[in-house]
């Protein structure tokens, strides 16, 4: 060992890193998360749960819109049908009233024509009788003064009979005209009452029909909402059950089952709402 000499030392260190693959299958309330890792790389998957729920939400939204759209269309159709029923009732009542008034007008016109013709015939008979009496009187005076008294008596009698016949005919025509006017007044009153009753019944029928349709639509909407709530609860239960699955393939199968079930329930709700509104 010299003056400036020193000691020598040597050391060796070894380190070994082992990488292991670890798959962890989870159970319980884990929200559908499955974690697996390889060394420092860790991945987590829900096996399509979120995407499935998004698709299901879209299906449920479309089904709800279709159901409420059908209910809205049925409400509009029922209101339009009730309004048309009321309009048709008034149109029918107006037609009946018009026909009745036209018939009464025709009867009155025929009665007036009959009275006019009767008075015309009576006037002609009286004119002819008086002319015949005048002619007979002149003939008797000119031909045989002895028969003048008898001719005058005969003429007077014939004139009286003609006047009586004309008076009876005139009275009969007036009685017939009065009776026709009375019948026309009764017919007009009857048709007016019938038209009023028909219009009232048409309005009552329209109101009842509208109320019935509104009740059906309200019941349909209520049932549709209840079915949608049940479908939502079922979807959430499926999602919860799926999140508790023990393997990747079982989770995928649960997703498909959930989507098919929700689509079927939504279609059933729409058909039920439509059939309820139609009935």
From Swiss-Prot:
Subcellular compartments: Host membrane
Spans traversing the lipid bilayer: 256-273
Keyword Transmembrane: yes
Recorded topology in the membrane: Single-pass membrane protein
Compositional bias of kind Low complexity: 9-23
Keyword flag DNA-binding: no
Region of interest: Disordered: 1-28
GO terms for cellular component: host cell membrane; membrane
First-listed, main subcellular location of the protein, grouped into a coarse class: host cell
UniProt keywords, alphabetically: Host membrane, Membrane, Transmembrane, Transmembrane helix
Name of protein: Uncharacterized protein Gp-j
UniProt organism field: Pseudoalteromonas phage PM2 (Bacteriophage PM2)
């Amino acid at each position: 060992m010299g003056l400036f000499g020193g000691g020598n030392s040597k050391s060796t260190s070894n380190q070994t890193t082992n990488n292991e693959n670890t798959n962890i299958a989870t159970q319980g309330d884990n929200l559908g998360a499955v974690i697996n890792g390889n060394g420092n790389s860790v991945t987590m998957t829900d096996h399509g749960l979120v995407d499935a729920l998004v698709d299901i939400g879209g299906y449920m939204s479309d089904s709800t819109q279709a159901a409420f759209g059908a209910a809205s269309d049925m409400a509009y159709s029922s209101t339009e049908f009730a309004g048309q029923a009321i309009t048709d009732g008034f149109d029918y009542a107006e037609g009946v009233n018009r026909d009745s008034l036209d018939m009464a007008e025709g009867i009155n016109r025929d009665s007036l024509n009959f009275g006019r013709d009767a008075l015309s015939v009576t006037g002609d008979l009286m004119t002819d009788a008086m002319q015949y009496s005048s002619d007979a009187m002149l003939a008797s005076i000119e031909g045989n003064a002895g028969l003048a008294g008898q001719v005058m008596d005969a003429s007077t009698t014939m004139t009286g009979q003609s006047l009586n016949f004309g008076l009876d005919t005139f009275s009969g025509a007036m009685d017939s005209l009065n009776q026709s006017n009375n019948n026309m007044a009764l017919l007009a009153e009857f048709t007016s009452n019938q038209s009023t009753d028909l219009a009232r019944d048409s309005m009552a029928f329209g109101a009842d029909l509208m109320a019935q349709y509104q009740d059906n639509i309200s019941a349909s909407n209520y049932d549709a909402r209840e079915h949608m709530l049940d479908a939502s609860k079922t979807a959430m239960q499926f999602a919860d059950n799926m999140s508790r699955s023990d393997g990747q393939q079982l989770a995928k199968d649960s997703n498909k089952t959930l989507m098919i079930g929700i689509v079927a329930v939504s279609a059933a709700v729409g058909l039920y709402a439509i059939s309820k509104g139609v009935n």
